[in-house]
Amino acid sequence: MWITALLLAVLLLVILHRVYVGLYAASSPNPFAEDVKRPPEPLVTDKEARKKVLKQAFSVSRVPEKLDAVVIGSGIGGLASAAVLAKAGKRVLVLEQHTKAGGCCHTFGENGLEFDTGIHYIGRMREGNIGRFILDQITEGQLDWAPMASPFDLMILEGPNGRKEFPMYSGRKEYIQGLKKKFPKEEAVIDKYMELVKVVARGVSHAVLLKFLPLPLTQLLSKFGLLTRFSPFCRASTQSLAEVLQQLGASRELQAVLSYIFPTYGVTPSHTAFSLHALLVDHYIQGAYYPRGGSSEIAFHTIPLIQRAGGAVLTRATVQSVLLDSAGRACGVSVKKGQELVNIYCPVVISNAGMFNTYQHLLPETVRHLPDVKKQLAMVRPGLSMLSIFICLKGTKEDLKLQSTNYYVYFDTDMDKAMERYVSMPKEKAPEHIPLLFIAFPSSKDPTWEERFPDRSTMTALVPMAFEWFEEWQEEPKGKRGVDYETLKNAFVEASMSVIMKLFPQLEGKVESVTGGSPLTNQYYLAAPRGATYGADHDLARLHPHAMASIRAQTPIPNLYLTGQDIFTCGLMGALQGALLCSSAILKRNLYSDLQALGSKVKAQKKKM
């Protein structure tokens, strides 16, 4: 029996090797053949210099000739895909509907200060980490990362018996010790949990492999239960976070504390997979970082690489549709320019606009109903939306005693029930029952802030929302949604500010202005369907091994590819993985192997120095 199993295993390995060679052994240039990192140059603060990179408005004369690809959307998924292709010698045009490139990495001005739109903190940005290495290669090492304070996160539990605080310290040992100090009677549970997090997170390469292998093969492996049997990551993708914590025997309060980070992926513990949660915990466990100079530095240092290869990144370029030829293959895009449409032709179209925008709005009506398109859409639904609050403060971080720590404020240990009650409430009552708040001080995270904005500071807060509360105004123009809309939005803002001022009483009299952005704001500026913060919902259905294998860069439409967070996971690093998967599919190269080889080469060179 065991001999038969061994022979079958060997046969499977041979088949996998041949399939892999056939799919990813092309002769495309290696974009990661050489280390392009160089010492960071001084921060560019000149507004005109930054505008030339980040705000190149669309015009026909600025469209490069003989394009190799067009990318829809300039978030990190789109920019990274374009940059990798540019490094392989491709001429790529990136089209952004907003006035500024960057997607969730762009910044905007409010009352003379700068706010980020989506980058609150990133993990594993120390020298030597793979995420840092990838970003160094697409920005030539010009992104500098500032470490945040330890604890990087502070969970605050407001209850009938007062306030409890649970710090999350940088460093695995310190992180675990911090938990055990708060839960001395549950040390064994904490040890089991942390070991499971480590084992599952290390298996994330299995999720990548699922998207590399032919779909029929992954379906076969899934059908016979081989994925969940041999892969801890795939197995954890079929178990909810709540289920795992209950099996470990954690108390209700410990379950809440271990689940505190769920707003970073937008799904409550009973509805998300433990695999995703483990990835996020492992991502931050060594500490958190913030881009020096703010999140717009990411786009600012990625775009020049695209331009040097003959490409361009153009803003104010709303793509109306993906063009198809007579054989049903993507062959370009149609861009709205004033009242006219401009057709741009190219052999490859990459969409960073997300699955819903791409399949439901950018494709011709007949193609939207293709069985394979409908199958993919049936696996996902729009994710959680949030209300953003942007607060301008008078005073430095020292004056105001502000830390670079993030604050997660909860009012109930049963996060699932609290959220379910909240989102099912009538919109008029909901502001009185906000279940959680995320609070951060971006100005305290950036070491260049004081030089750029002396004697002033910023605070941001995020509040979960039901899109249905704002749905009636979605057809109304921005800025003209009426008194009822503003009243509802302000009710959430005022309720949040009441909590914030109790937590930070030193800010009394220091608040200069408060601005709220509803899910409709997200929908308008980021083209996020239903204002979804993280694209497709990161629930158990989406993270099931079958769905992970099915949702990939290649689409049912030849020459049309997806990139970004919808084909891997949310966040900067998730979208970056989506870009690598997309670029690998287009170049027919395993870029992960290329990066690994370059990393080994760089390490060997450093040893000789």
Swiss-Prot record:
It is found in: Endoplasmic reticulum membrane. Its EC number is 1.3.99.23. Its main location: endoplasmic reticulum. GO terms for cellular component: endoplasmic reticulum membrane; nuclear membrane; nuclear outer membrane. Changing E96A: Loss of catalytic activity, as measured by the saturation of retinol to 13,14-dihydroretinol. Loss of adipocyte differentiation in a 3T3-L1 cell culture model. Coiled coil: none annotated. The keyword Membrane applies. It is an enzyme of class 1 (oxidoreductase). Induction: Up-regulated during starvation. Up-regulated by PPARG. It catalyses: all-trans-13,14-dihydroretinol + A = all-trans-retinol + AH2. Disruption phenotype: Knockout mice fed either low-fat or high-fat (HFD) diets gain weight at a similar rate as their wild-type littermates and show normal insulin resistance and glucose tolerance. However, they exhibit increased adiposity and increased expression of key adipogenic markers, including PPAR-gamma and its target adipocyte P2 (aP2/FABP4), while maintained on an HFD. One of its GO terms (biological process) is retinol metabolic process. Catalyzes the saturation of all-trans-retinol to all-trans-13,14-dihydroretinol. Does not exhibit any activity toward all-trans-retinoic acid, nor 9-cis, 11-cis or 13-cis-retinol isomers. May play a role in the metabolism of vitamin A. Independently of retinol conversion, may regulate liver metabolism upstream of MLXIPL/ChREBP. Required for adipocyte differentiation in a 3T3-L1 cell culture model. This effect seems not to mimic the in vivo situation in which animals show increased adiposity in the absence of RETSAT. Belongs to the carotenoid/retinoid oxidoreductase family. CrtISO subfamily. This is All-trans-retinol 13,14-reductase. The gene is Retsat.
